Amino acid sequence: MLARSGVLSLAFTLLTGHAAAIDLDINSKDSIKSAAKVLASGIVAFYDETLNEDLIPGLFPHPYYWWESGLAFNALVDYYGLTNDSEYNSRISEALQHQLGDYDAFMPANQTKVLGNDDQSFWGLASLSAHEVQLPAPASGSWLEFAKNVFDTQTSRWDTHSCDGGLKWQIFTFNDGYNYKNAASNGQLFLLAARLADQTGNATYAEWANKIYNWTTEVGLVSADQHVYDGTDDRQNCSAVNHIQWTNNHAEFTEGAALMYKASNGSQKWTDIVTGFVKASSTFTGDGGALIEAACEKNGKCDIDQRAFKGIAVRSFGRAAQVAPIVADSIHAMLNASAKGAAKNCESGGDNVVCGLSWSSSSNGTSEQATAADGNLGEVLNALQAIQALLWPTVKFINSTIGTVSPNATTSGSPTGTSDGAQHTGSGATLAASFTLVLAIAFTTALSC
């Protein structure tokens, strides 16, 4: 399915000399928007072709997993919010609504086999982004409500049976990774809680953000100097940590910390944390200051998932700089270098665009350029998010409360309220349990067919 006619068209264009690197002047808003448009149109063209063949809104084809589709639509939501170009809004809205699942929490039954907590939260974060930029309201419910549903289902899964807490990577026992408590799932729940606190002013979200962050430091997923490690096995009571580091995890923790810094009016605790994360991000910068995926980029061994991580990272770093000016200068230097490198390693011709993974000369030659349709959706998404991240300083978080929401509340106990003040022993937990049971039955039935 990835071998498309568009690839052949682009190959012909390249051979005849009409393709060129994407033109980008990082000091020109018009140039940034124009470059972003080229990349967004390449992603949407691939999506449209997929939709015409498969007729399932919200999905990209194999080998892309469900979570990356959520990432793609989050990037397109941002594209609308940052450029004010609404051309793709109807597609975005249809995709998000189609992937909600029966209970409006981004748990579609047909994704049960690949549905982890981090996968679900990618879509929840996209829905919250839709709320922030005021994407036209869905047919029923609201983008904010859908994001809250994700939060409520995930906090009901907070597991104190091992490691004194934490969120497992996988939701269902039959999926590989069920006993792994990882930075991706816990970091994205931390970020979701911090963003909901920012958007609603509800202190329960801030309490949960504190609780999650404190737990990650206690088990060693986040080190004392703010390095973020991949995960730990709860069958060993989280006594051994996998120390591999990824850009996306680091940046999402950075964004969450920046939001807590904002909510606490620059408290010393969150000042130290957010500046620590930015200092530790030097792990991921190459020659010239551009972002690199240090664990796999230089040796050319990034897999299909890992090749999309840098886009997540530049997005979160850009948002962190917006709400925590204390770290803005350092982050903007990295974003500028990354955007330049991304534009340089993408070429466009006609309706086609190809991108490679590398933005830094220190890792050049470790990946090939290709279109989204020919296997490089992650690379094109990375470039889009790197370039449009330059626009974050020009916009405000729409609907943000910007107020203090008690982010330093104690977490020695367990915040028990949901976003609406109800106890988790009530409807929130019951609904989440129903989700899990229904989807497990659906998956078991599917296996028996």
Where are these regions (language model features)?
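Short coil/turn connectors between adjacent alpha-helices in alpha-solenoid helical repeat scaffolds
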Residues: 84-87, 134-144, 200-204
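Cleavable N-terminal signal peptides of Sec/SRP-targeted secreted and luminal proteins
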Residues: 3-21, 437-443
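Active-site cradle of extracellular carbohydrate-active enzymes
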Residues: 186-200, 204-261, 274, 278-281
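Extended ligand-binding groove/face enriched in aromatic
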Residues: 93-194
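CBM-like carbohydrate-recognition segments
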Residues: 22-75, 79-118, 122, 130, ...
